[in-house]
Curated annotation (Swiss-Prot):
Purpose: Accessory subunit of the mitochondrial membrane respiratory chain NADH dehydrogenase (Complex I), that is believed not to be involved in catalysis. Complex I functions in the transfer of electrons from NADH to the respiratory chain. The immediate electron acceptor for the enzyme is believed to be ubiquinone. Involved in the interferon/all-trans-retinoic acid (IFN/RA) induced cell death. This apoptotic activity is inhibited by interaction with viral IRF1. Prevents the transactivation of STAT3 target genes.
Species per Swiss-Prot/TrEMBL record: Pan troglodytes
Positions carrying N-acetylalanine: 2
Lineage start: Eukaryota, Metazoa, Chordata, Craniata, Vertebrata
Protein name: NADH dehydrogenase [ubiquinone] 1 alpha subcomplex subunit 13
Localization, UniProt: Mitochondrion inner membrane; Nucleus
Transmembrane spans: 30-51
Family, similarity comment: Belongs to the complex I NDUFA13 subunit family.
Amino acid sequence: MAASKVKQDMPPPGGYGPIDYKRNLPRRGLSGYSMLAIGIGTLIYGHWSIMKWNRERRRLQIEDFEARIALLPLLQAETDRRTLQMLRENLEEEAIIMKDVPDWKVGESVFHTTRWVPPLIGELYGLRTTEEALHASHGFMWYM
């Protein structure tokens, strides 16, 4: 068996040309320093705008508090007037209910004191409907 001669591929005469192996990426976008400067500038502007808004919000909050403080005596007087009206209506109802009970004193204080004690919700709304009592104790938070 005759061995066949293998022909090996060889470089062209004079060799191959030089191979360019460096990365040749095009420049894209801003440099790192300019992006850092833009980021810091954005942070400073955001901080400044938040401080400005917080000052405005604080000024509006102070204005609201001053308005509430100015209206507080009026609202307290309205609440006191409503409470006294309800107590008077309760005393009239108590007089009607307890008229046949001997030795019953209408409006006698259960606290045995001469000082003013704000009435409890149950005392004010004891003779009222359940809806009124629920509205007074829970406001608009109940859904029944």
